[in-house]
Amino acid sequence: MTYSELANIIHESARLDHEGGIIRSYETRLEKASITPKPIKVITGIRRSGKSYLLKKLYRKLIDTDGISVSNILFLNFEDDRLIQQQNLTSLRNIYELFLTAVNSTQPVYIFLDEIQYVSGWERFVRTIYDSTLHHIYITGSNSHLLSSEFSTSLGGRILEFHIFPFSFAEFLQSFQIKIPQNPFEWAELRSSITFRFEQYVKFGGLPEIINLPESEKLNARNSLIEKIIVRDVINRFKLRYPTILKSLYLYLELHTGDIASSKNIANYIKNQGEIKNLSDKTVKIYLEYLEKTFLVMAIKKFSYKTKEIFSEQKKYYFVDNIFSVLADPEDWLENVVFNHLIRVNDPSNVYYGRDERGREVDFVIRNSDQRLDAIQVCYKLTDDNLDREIRTLKLFSEYNKDRLGKLELVYQFDERSRKSEIADITLIEASHKLLPQN
């Protein structure tokens, strides 16, 4: 590779396809962190959530605002087909040495390595650069392996992670130039626009690169993205021998979004479909872990004061974005967006579901920092009939947890009750309100 070829690759890797867009909180935090070369900045998240876009915007800021020479920024996207043959430690080192030949020694050096997980031995390269230079190092990846490898363990606290989610509902509205209501009058003025966009958000999610596409193209983009995640990030990466099992597992999760399930239940379901006869719950468990490593799905455990029950096999699985669950029921779409809101505003390890010995279920239990417990029920259409059932469940939860009780909430999308009265000790809140900043 010549320096001219490298310069062209860097230019193409760092090119912004469009200017503007909303300013995400991650962007501000990343800019602040760029002041000092250490620690290493690691950006993780599902494919197409905006990781590369954040790097590209920082690249432009460094050049256009901070005056950093373009020759001092090595920006490599390892999904570029020109770098497929360079996805090894020796080639990466050679590219780095070539890059250094034109660096301006009076300015800092920046190393941007996008989708680094494809490079065999990348950990040793980054560790060497970190230990021997004052370069600013940024790496991105669509696999949690980045932070579970020996690399992150050996570096200890010398890594600063930015985990990127798809757009929140607030960001989704901002991307369509809809302001966030600050008072009841603004809510009244903007209600129809917010309701329309919320229905879109619930159905198709908030992946930045998909939200502006026509509906038919959204589905095509979704299918292409799922195929890439399943084939490249799981089947190829982990060298799976039975790809049909993984695809059947994905379909199960999509059709049963938010259901309580175990590896054994899922294995039995897939076998009962007829195509796959031999499938162990151990294999299902391993494949579920692979999907979680791609950030595609997340699992929550049952809340219990008994450690054994918390670590039982019975979990609820959700997708990181609703574009991945279009085959689910509308009720499950709503529960999935509420889940994604809750893990943004809470420590994900403190988000659970609740279930008693008679099978009565609370959709979400939040353990707060003061150890108080919030209970949240999600109801797609609130009617006179199901209101009583949802209230009984929340009241039962409050009786079980009197000494630690926090808030009780019933989140709904449509209210079809004949009488819309308030309920003592329980907050009824429309989902579009729940997902926006509270004033």
Predicted regions and their residues:
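Interdomain motor-coupling "hinge/lid" segment immediately C-terminal to the ATP-binding subdomain
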Residues: 2-6, 150-259
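Conserved lysine of the Walker
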Residues: 51
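Hydrophobic positions on the alpha1 helix immediately C-terminal to the Walker A/P-loop
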Residues: 54
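Domain-level recognition of nuclease-like catalytic cores that cleave nucleotide substrates
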Residues: 413-439
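Short glycine-rich substrate-engagement loop in P-loop NTPases that contacts/grips substrate
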Residues: 75-106
